[in-house]
Amino acid sequence: SWNLGRYQRRPEAFDDAQVRTLHWHFKWAVAVAGANPRVSKDKVRQLEASLEEFYRSGGASMHVVHGERASVAGLLGLEEEAAEELAAWRATHRDENADCEGCDPMRQVAFAYRTEAWELAVATAVPVLTGAVSCSVQPQTTQSLVLLPLLASGRPRAAWEAHLRSYREIRRNPKALISLAYHLEYLALVGRVDRGLELLRRHLSWL
């Protein structure tokens, strides 16, 4: 908030690279606030409105704004709102503020996961699962998220392979705690409780 206030008072003091960094930090702030139960819904809404105002003032695409709103709506259990924001997200063009092509689709995969639209989740994830797009956290992050969709849509072998490949990549990364949770859920559902307990014991220090 300090950097944003300084930019609003003296925009000429920021070069293009610093402004771009501010765009990214602001969208991350909205995501973190939305996931923190200690931050009130009203405060999150204020941040969303400020994000839109900031992006519009710089002529940025609303793609990121709609994407963040969709994610926050999902966290708040507002799936109709999430669906509307996702539709707007798909309809707006990506720009330099958007997540990479490997990570950006996770918004729709997450929505499909929450609403049990298993085929949509798998179809959205295909470019990442096939290696057509990737980054430092992909495909392993998406692989963990689609474990249940793969299983529920009748692809048990693909789910097991995704589990093995994803876990191999995340096992040394404490920042992948959420991904680990998907693996534990999957292992419980397929009756591999022994392996699930083994992974839980191995990663207790992440908690």
Task: Specify the residue positions occupied by each region the protein language model found.
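Alpha-solenoid helical repeat scaffolds
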Residues: 40-43, 55-63, 68, 77-87, ...
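Amphipathic alpha-helical protein-interaction segments enriched in hydrophobic
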Residues: 137-141, 174-186, 207
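Long, ordered, amphipathic alpha-helical scaffolds
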Residues: 181-207
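Solenoid-like repeat scaffolds
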Residues: 5-14, 50-60, 87-99, 126-137, ...
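N-terminal low-complexity, intrinsically disordered segments
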Residues: 133, 149-179, 187, 191
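Helix-turn-helix repeat elements of alpha-solenoid scaffolds
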Residues: 1-8, 35-50, 73-88, 112-126, ...
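Tandem amphipathic alpha-helical repeat scaffolds
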Residues: 20-37, 61-78, 102-115, 141-152, ...
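N-terminal membrane-targeting/anchoring modules of bacterial envelope and secretion proteins
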Residues: 1-2, 6-32
